[in-house]
């Protein structure tokens, strides 16, 4: 899978702004990220922040690639209408809603038939 658009940010708000501007018009993007407790020497966002911002805008994470220079790039793309939702991501969305971070696009992507009252 080819990396067509690579985003590299230090600040979660920069990714949020990009997704707010492009969530309805782009097919995908790749975001430089890291996993673990120690931040790398280059600009990158923690994996959880990348995933949360994707969910806030109706997108999902998929492929993770290591770039030739050692950086990790996480692919994000819009969710398909009838895609499978894990309990983890549904619960993340509910938490993001409680925190006031969900957008209208993110809410529209959540499968209401999979959310029950016990999760709220």
What is each of the regions a protein language model found here?
Residues 1-120:
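Charge-dense, helix-prone N-terminal extensions
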